[in-house]
């Protein structure tokens, strides 16, 4: 993904601490205080320009959403959507997914969305894939006992890799769609990438994976 440089992005993000939380470590285990309720928390890793998370928040006011994006020049687009919509159940983080356990306590998150993650196709970059086992270990920690992961991609190789990685780690595959837009799934909210890829006729792959059963 080629990113357009926006040198003003960090300053704009800093100007809206009510939307882009500047100190997520201080919120660890206390995100419900920020939202002012005990509703479940869903996070999107790689929230991009924010179309998915803002639309989901409108459709599901009974859920709190946190979008995580590494690149400030991308996150400002999500911030603009949040400023315009003033959705009370969305917050954003300009952060790296490697630090998830610094931001969220064990069992604090009900669902993780991985939408069109970078597939990092080269073998030497395997550890960067968001479904590599080291990332799955982070997800396992922050997910609640009945928590799950929802993944979508147009990259067949990455999808197949993810299914194997999730299964080997112990996640339970609860749903697998090999052609999402020709399936019977209801209520699918598309991301910017999903609209772009599906318009080209690309097949969209999707799966749901339940957190590994815990030893009693």
UniProtKB/Swiss-Prot annotation:
Pathway: tRNA modification; N(7)-methylguanine-tRNA biosynthesis
GO CC term, one of those recorded: tRNA methyltransferase complex
Binding site for S-adenosyl-L-methionine: 44, 69, 96, 118
Any Pfam family hit: Methyltransf_4
Residues annotated for substrate binding in this entry: 122, 154, 191-194
EC number(s) given by UniProt: 2.1.1.33
GO MF terms, alphabetically ordered: tRNA (guanine(46)-N7)-methyltransferase activity
Positions of region (Interaction with RNA): 124-129
Listed InterPro entries: SAM-dependent_MTases_sf, tRNA_(Gua-N-7)_MeTrfase_Trmb, tRNA_methyltr_TrmB_bact
Gene3D superfamilies membership: Vaccinia Virus protein VP39
Reactions catalysed: guanosine(46) in tRNA + S-adenosyl-L-methionine = N(7)-methylguanosine(46) in tRNA + S-adenosyl-L-homocysteine
Active site: 118
Keywords: Methyltransferase, S-adenosyl-L-methionine, Transferase, tRNA processing
PANTHER family for the chain: 3-DEOXY-D-MANNO-OCTULOSONIC-ACID TRANSFERASE/TRNA GUANINE-N 7 - -METHYLTRANSFERASE, PENTACOTRIPEPTIDE-REPEAT REGION OF PRORP DOMAIN-CONTAINING PROTEIN
Protein function: Catalyzes the formation of N(7)-methylguanine at position 46 (m7G46) in tRNA.
Protein family (similarity comment): Belongs to the class I-like SAM-binding methyltransferase superfamily. TrmB family.
Protein name stated in the entry: tRNA (guanine-N(7)-)-methyltransferase
Gene that produces this protein: trmB
